[in-house]
Amino acid sequence: MPDNRRELIKYRLESARERLNSAEVLLASKSYKDSIGRSYYAMFTAVRALLAKDGVDYSKHAGVISYFQREYIKTQKFEKKYSKYLSQAFQIRNNTDYADFFVVSFEDAREQADRAREFLTAIEEFLKAEDIGENK
């Protein structure tokens, strides 16, 4: 794998962790909608690390999600629950950003942050097993 791809993977994983950390900070400050957005972007950016491994990218979120489902869920490289986590996070994030009067509770935001942490960990472990993780 070209070094620039490894660097991109590393960068995207670092960005995903930073976004997850931001989600936790926002959750603690009771900014639940913004926390949900950061949780989604932690997952989305982690998936983009996988795409960097494969040498592909998409300009739209739906393209990234579809690729993940096709190449990583349907091939059973990841459990189906991760497809659900990502799809639901995308939908909830859209609602928090664009829907009027969309109410988010602490529990909603906590669940999304927990799922994002699990999701990111799964991707990091996968990349490490592929000998592509951050320490490579």
Predicted stretch roles:
Residues 1-136:
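Terminal alpha-helical segments
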